[in-house]
């Protein structure tokens, strides 16, 4: 039998702080109550619910302003990657989300995997790509990633072929 609860914190997939929700008893007993993420709804929780919703609105406004500021700053950022390619400009491997996060950290832009709505996103060809990011309060941003070839490897291959042809001829 499901129990009615008042969430004290945002819980992914369940609700936001101040929401009245229902959940299964095991989830309530083993996770929500011990982690202090919810309280069992009763007559006294209505005042607490109003207070939590007011706090959530204030926090949401601050988060949205921060997210919009971050989105504006990300418009001017270009992350550049040089990758090895074969003579036909086919990449060896790909540029993954982990690569993007690491390169962004070098520029003091700290992203986490949950910022990327497409978790298995990988760039597998050369060129410029706009990567969508999901920030707080449903604010979205785009990050420009430019993938170029590392011509050294292609040059080494071409020189190797030329020396083979010279030795044959």
Swiss-Prot record:
Family: Belongs to the bacterial ribosomal protein bL9 family.
Role, per record: Binds to the 23S rRNA.
Gene: rplI
Record has Ubl conjugation as a keyword: no
Database matches in SUPFAM superfamilies: L9 N-domain-like (SSF55658), Ribosomal protein L9 C-domain (SSF55653)
GO BP of this protein: translation
GO molecular function terms noted in the UniProt entry: rRNA binding; structural constituent of ribosome
Family annotation (Pfam families): Ribosomal_L9_C, Ribosomal_L9_N
Keyword list, A-Z: Ribonucleoprotein, Ribosomal protein, RNA-binding, rRNA-binding
Stated name of the protein: Large ribosomal subunit protein bL9
InterPro entries registered for this protein in UniProt: Ribosomal_bL9 (IPR000244), Ribosomal_bL9/RNase_H1_N (IPR009027), Ribosomal_bL9_bac/chp (IPR020594), Ribosomal_bL9_C (IPR020069), Ribosomal_bL9_C_sf (IPR036791), Ribosomal_bL9_N (IPR020070), Ribosomal_bL9_N_sf (IPR036935)
A GO cellular component entry from the record: ribonucleoprotein complex
Domain of life: Bacteria
Stored PANTHER family: 50S RIBOSOMAL PROTEIN L9
């Amino acid at each position: 039998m499901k129990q009615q609860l008042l969430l004290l914190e945002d819980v992914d997939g369940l609700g936001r702080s101040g929401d009245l929700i229902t959940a299964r008893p095991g989830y309530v007993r083993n996770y929500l109550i011990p982690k202090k993420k919810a309280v069992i709804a009763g007559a006294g929780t209505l005042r607490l619910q109003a207070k939590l919703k007011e706090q959530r609105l204030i926090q949401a406004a601050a988060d949205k302003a921060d997210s919009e500021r971050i989105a504006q700053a990300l418009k001017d950022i270009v992350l550049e990657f040089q990758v090895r390619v074969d003579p036909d400009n086919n990449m060896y491997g790909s540029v993954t989300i982990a690569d993007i996060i690491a390169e962004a950290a070098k520029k003091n832009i700290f992203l986490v995997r949950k910022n990327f709505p497409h978790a298995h996103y990988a760039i597998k060809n050369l060129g410029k790509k706009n990567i969508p990011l999901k920030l707080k309060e449903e604010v979205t941003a785009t990050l420009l990633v430019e993938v170029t070839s590392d011509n050294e490897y292609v040059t080494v291959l071409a020189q190797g072929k030329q020396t083979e042809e010279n030795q044959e001829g």
